């Protein structure tokens, strides 16, 4: 038996709003269980928050669907023996281990109650068929269902970065690391694709933040949700994933598409535009540190950007040159799975563009998941 993470998120700063604080609010997150386990612990983080945070209580229960419905075995988690937990700015806390049996394909429902004014800066936005969250006014942690009149869905996950399960030795985790493309649907579809193929001993863990770059990060609030640069997030995000064997890195497109010149955007100077060697060095940084954690690491090629709002041929060229480098490494060729070369530029294949010419469609995310599973499990490179 061993500990394996069955759920995970990166940490960033949320999109800025005049209201930075919440009071008397319940957060609820349903989590898919990929395999059976007998004990449970969760990790909460305030990694990107600059004020201390107190959570009054954290409640878990079982569920039968990706919804807010708690079905049975409702219990409080404790932190150093207390129901309440406190995190310093940029800090974290791990719950006490609890004996809690979960079956494969069940759902774990995690609810957190924020009693006093709480800085909600530290969080991340995620989407996908296995990703959902809720907030509700008042303490509804023990409610079987959240009140319809005082609750709403949200894609923002606050504080919750890891759920760890004590499980059989054959079970393990795959980490998917990246930016908005990975914070969106394909890791969830990968988990579903594994299940479709009766590969039932793998948990897919997402560690991704929209807008992140390998080499740089923003210091302004308009882009605070675009997260930390690679050297400020990579080690922190992967080192806490229990039972991980494999890492997939799909990162670098924002380094290429963001710089436009201060005449267009004061926060995006053209001097931020990386060279090919700088991008390679950034990827080598990831690979060198991944070795420390004994991870089998694959890199994902960057997907098409043709007709994106900052598209230019020089961006196309460096993207394609970077992809050629990535293909010399153990890699998953997402670019050719959902894109095609037309007149020296990669376009999305029919049905694979979400509409913004940068992010894949749901069909494309499914194809990316299939490509990832084929590569990792069928040696189909």
Regions inferred by a protein language model and the residue ranges of each:
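A general structural detector for well-ordered alpha-helical segments in enzyme core domains, enriched
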Residues: 234, 279-286, 318, 322-326
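Active-site segments of SGNH/GDSL-like serine hydrolases
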Residues: 250-255, 286-319
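Conserved SGNH/GDSL esterase-like catalytic core that processes O-acyl groups on lipids
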Residues: 58-61, 170-281, 359
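Feature marks short, surface-exposed loop/turn motifs that line or immediately flank catalytic pockets
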Residues: 116, 211-213, 255-257, 306, ...
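Structured segments of extracytoplasmic/periplasmic soluble domains
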Residues: 193-197, 207, 237, 241, ...
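Catalytic His-Asp segment of secreted/periplasmic serine-dependent ester chemistry enzymes
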Residues: 302-381
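N-terminal secretory targeting modules
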Residues: 1-175, 182-183, 188, 196-199, ...
């Amino acid at each position: 038996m061993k500990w394996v993470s069955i759920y995970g998120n990166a940490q960033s700063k949320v999109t800025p709003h005049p209201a930075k604080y919440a009071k008397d609010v319940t957060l609820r997150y349903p989590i898919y269980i990929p395999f059976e386990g007998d004990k449970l612990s969760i990790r909460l983080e305030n990694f990107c928050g600059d004020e201390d945070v107190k959570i009054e209580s954290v409640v878990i229960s079982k569920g039968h669907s990706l919804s807010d419905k708690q079905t049975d075995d409702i219990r409080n988690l404790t932190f150093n023996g207390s129901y309440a937990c406190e995190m310093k700015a940029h800090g974290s806390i791990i719950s006490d281990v609890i004996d809690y049996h979960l079956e494969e394909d069940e759902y774990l429902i995690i609810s957190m109650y924020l009693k006093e004014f709480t800085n909600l800066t530290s969080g991340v936005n995620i989407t996908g068929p296995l990703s959902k969250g809720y907030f509700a006014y008042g303490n509804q942690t023990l409610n079987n269902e959240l009140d319809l009149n005082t609750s709403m869905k949200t894609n923002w996950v606050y504080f919750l970065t890891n759920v760890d399960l004590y499980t059989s030795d054959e079970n393990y985790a795959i980490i998917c690391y990246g930016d908005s493309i990975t914070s969106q649907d394909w890791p969830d579809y990968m988990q579903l694709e594994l299940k479709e193929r009766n590969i039932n001993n793998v948990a897919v863990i997402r560690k991704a933040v929209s807008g992140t770059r390998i080499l740089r990060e923003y210091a302004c609030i308009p882009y605070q949700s675009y997260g930390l640069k690679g050297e400020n997030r990579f080690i922190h995000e992967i080192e806490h994933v229990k039972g991980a064997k494999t890492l997939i890195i799909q990162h670098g497109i924002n380094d290429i598409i963001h710089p436009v010149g201060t005449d267009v955007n004061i926060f995006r100077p053209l001097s931020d535009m990386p060279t090919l060697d700088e991008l390679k060095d950034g990827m080598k940084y990831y690979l060198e540190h991944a070795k420390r954690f004994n991870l089998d690491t694959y890199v994902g090629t960057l997907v098409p950007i043709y007709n994106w709002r900052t598209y230019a041929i020089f961006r196309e060229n460096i993207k394609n040159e970077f992809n050629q480098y990535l293909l010399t490494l153990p890699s998953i060729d997402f670019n050719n799975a959902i894109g095609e070369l037309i007149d020296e530029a990669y376009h999305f294949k029919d049905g694979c563009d979400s509409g913004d010419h940068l992010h894949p469609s749901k069909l494309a995310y499914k194809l990316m998941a299939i490509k990832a599973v084929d590569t990792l499990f069928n040696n189909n490179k």
